[in-house]
């Protein structure tokens, strides 16, 4: 699993989705926590670092669409 980045941070996932990063898998834990899995690459690592440092700008409508899209996936695949 070295080449897989996993996160349950919904806003990070929405940000990455807004930047056209595709997740490979969604895992559900026993406590209903959802974990998104991405293939690691340089572009993903840069986006995550910039997100953590508050250096990203995302178009608001694209971010809102990503949130809605992800919530639909989460709640329709229970």
PLM features: residue spans?
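C-terminal basic regulatory modules in eukaryotic proteins
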Residues: 5, 46-78
């Amino acid at each position: 699993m070295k080449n897989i980045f996993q996160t349950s941070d919904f806003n990070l996932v929405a940000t990455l989705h807004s930047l056209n990063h595709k997740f490979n898998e969604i895992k559900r834990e026993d406590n209903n926590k959802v974990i998104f899995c991405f293939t690691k690459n340089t572009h993903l690592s840069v986006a995550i670092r910039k997100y953590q440092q508050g250096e990203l700008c995302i178009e608001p409508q694209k971010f809102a669409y990503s949130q809605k899209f992800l919530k639909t996936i989460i709640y329709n695949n229970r």
